[in-house]
Amino acid sequence: KQKRSVVRPIVADLRKRYTVSAAEVGHLDVHRRTVIGVSAVAADRGHVVDVLDAVERSAAAHPEVELLSVRRRVVSSEDF
């Protein structure tokens, strides 16, 4: 419960502030770790990169959070 009380407000803040999809997607049973997945859709790749940069900064700015790693994948319609 303590973990959820930290993670839920962060996920809700990211969704509201940046209009992205965000959810806790990993390490669900590990007390001191989590994985938060974020996705964004836009016509312009540059805009998606800017939004994801801002989301990363925002998540890292929470004093109760230590960002251990970030993985990013940007997919374009040209990739299909």
Where in this protein do the model-derived segments appear?
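C-terminal binding/interaction regions
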Residues: 3
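Short catalytic helix/loop segments, enriched in acidic residues and glycine
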Residues: 10-11
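Short, flexible active-site-proximal loops enriched in glycine and acidic residues
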Residues: 20-26, 65-69
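Short, charge-patterned binding micro-sites
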Residues: 22-44
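C-terminal structural segments of small proteins and small subunits
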Residues: 42-80
